[in-house]
UniProtKB/Swiss-Prot annotation:
<feature type="region of interest" description="Type E(+) motif">
    <location>
        <begin position="580"/>
        <end position="610"/>
    </location>
</feature>
<dbReference type="InterPro" id="IPR046960">
    <property type="entry name" value="PPR_At4g14850-like_plant"/>
</dbReference>
<feature type="repeat" description="PPR 2">
    <location>
        <begin position="76"/>
        <end position="110"/>
    </location>
</feature>
<dbReference type="InterPro" id="IPR046848">
    <property type="entry name" value="E_motif"/>
</dbReference>
<dbReference type="Pfam" id="PF01535">
    <property type="entry name" value="PPR"/>
</dbReference>
<dbReference type="InterPro" id="IPR002885">
    <property type="entry name" value="Pentatricopeptide_rpt"/>
</dbReference>
<feature type="repeat" description="PPR 11">
    <location>
        <begin position="365"/>
        <end position="396"/>
    </location>
</feature>
<feature type="repeat" description="PPR 1">
    <location>
        <begin position="45"/>
        <end position="75"/>
    </location>
</feature>
<feature type="repeat" description="PPR 12">
    <location>
        <begin position="398"/>
        <end position="432"/>
    </location>
</feature>
<feature type="repeat" description="PPR 10">
    <location>
        <begin position="330"/>
        <end position="360"/>
    </location>
</feature>
<feature type="repeat" description="PPR 14">
    <location>
        <begin position="469"/>
        <end position="499"/>
    </location>
</feature>
<dbReference type="InterPro" id="IPR011990">
    <property type="entry name" value="TPR-like_helical_dom_sf"/>
</dbReference>
<feature type="repeat" description="PPR 3">
    <location>
        <begin position="111"/>
        <end position="138"/>
    </location>
</feature>
<dbReference type="Pfam" id="PF20431">
    <property type="entry name" value="E_motif"/>
</dbReference>
<comment type="similarity">
    <text>Belongs to the PPR family. PCMP-E subfamily.</text>
</comment>
<feature type="repeat" description="PPR 7">
    <location>
        <begin position="236"/>
        <end position="262"/>
    </location>
</feature>
<keyword id="KW-0677">Repeat</keyword>
Amino acid sequence: MQSRALSRLRSYYKRSSVFPSSDNDRSVQLFNLVRSIYSSSSRPRVPQPEWLIGELCKVGKIAEARKLFDGLPERDVVTWTHVITGYIKLGDMREARELFDRVDSRKNVVTWTAMVSGYLRSKQLSIAEMLFQEMPERNVVSWNTMIDGYAQSGRIDKALELFDEMPERNIVSWNSMVKALVQRGRIDEAMNLFERMPRRDVVSWTAMVDGLAKNGKVDEARRLFDCMPERNIISWNAMITGYAQNNRIDEADQLFQVMPERDFASWNTMITGFIRNREMNKACGLFDRMPEKNVISWTTMITGYVENKENEEALNVFSKMLRDGSVKPNVGTYVSILSACSDLAGLVEGQQIHQLISKSVHQKNEIVTSALLNMYSKSGELIAARKMFDNGLVCQRDLISWNSMIAVYAHHGHGKEAIEMYNQMRKHGFKPSAVTYLNLLFACSHAGLVEKGMEFFKDLVRDESLPLREEHYTCLVDLCGRAGRLKDVTNFINCDDARLSRSFYGAILSACNVHNEVSIAKEVVKKVLETGSDDAGTYVLMSNIYAANGKREEAAEMRMKMKEKGLKKQPGCSWVKVGKQNHLFVVGDKSHPQFEALDSILSDLRNKMRKNKNVTSDAEEAEFLVI
């Protein structure tokens, strides 16, 4: 004869609609367990419905758990807490609170703590505080939960205050406070607390090692690491990461070589460290030796090659990743490889990657679609970029995506199309941002739409909610400078609100040099010198402007002032990549092994330029680059 519990179970589980149909689902496995009870001839061990409710809540099947819960004739506090916790895990605090309030006097400290934790997880700190204060009793877990909530919200002092009030503490309490202080960079306080700990475990030691290393105190971190009574792989990784992040890659490598075991984080940290140190060969060698690679490993290598402008190598690694097939690209992978395609103007490769993205879960990701727009833009495929935008392939038409499309047109000199895109954006109810205006000014500048650009700048000035950045002023200079209307900029030179830097004034002076605007240049130089800025570039530019306009005495005077102040112009430099080798050239430097041949070629070019009257001033003659 079957037990009473089995009879109760049968009434609940005959309604198979309670459960979903997926065989891979743990809830179905639970259902199959119950079915086996009915088919068993021997007397089975019957799981209680309360147990099944708890299991369903653990796997997120709250709807099924709730149906079973509502059908129970009697419920104990454990079952109530299971269902409340199930709702909390899904972020449904409204339903969790409704059940919590129904429990009344039956709820225990576990139920209360679960609710406090739920409100903290949902960023409702004030409600969590009130609930914590209302608790009829608290245990150490309750205190730890609230302390961690304060710490995660950045209220470290409040967390410390609560920590001091605790009637009893366990090692989790101490570790939580140490980690919280470390994360906020309050290392001395963390160390003081660490030294006061009655007992330390590997988590305590690792938190301090990690905190010291991340705050630049690598040697102190190493001394602590060496004193650890026991270490786990997280401890080793913390120390290696500390060395790598502080540009001490050789020491990181030495430690890496003697690790008793390594995980993905160990290998990936070292690869990242070598890449940051511009040692791509070592990074590649380590990557090839990895026993197993995850998506971070592949993405790190791809990103490293992109950052080092070795875009073809990045594409090769991406191809190997696809052939390997053990992991799928993530958002970071796609963004990096699309950046490589953009730099190479590799439209075919970019289109192939677009096809992969369209079949992945990332096809609507905002960052990925923005990278696709950028790739099509740099490849000159404006129609493809616009098609993506118009056909809804961009995840959502928010301000970022509108700005991206305006930038696409702006950077290709399609000023009118950029403005039309802006007008459509306004019709859709979007308010322009500072970035929007920057793109519009750039578009107008490169399309020669001076009046329209000036209108946009005035709109920006009138909108007090938006910051006026240096880049806006620099774009304005470029806009007016290209049209030979630098006088329109002078009104902004004396504007008190315009926090302008040397690069802004340098842009005006460069434009004055092109358009021979001596009077405006003098006004700008006066303003620069009034700010107390003594920059060699200012004197050199003004000297060149004087020289270009035949004012040799004034030019010589500027050079003399520069000399009296002990200012020297930073030597110009440039570099070119031939094959896989970078060649650096600095003004006045003759150390390059092919200097004589290069100097001869440049001299021939210089003579041809003179014959074609391409050299326009004595100033330019003096500034001629000598390798």
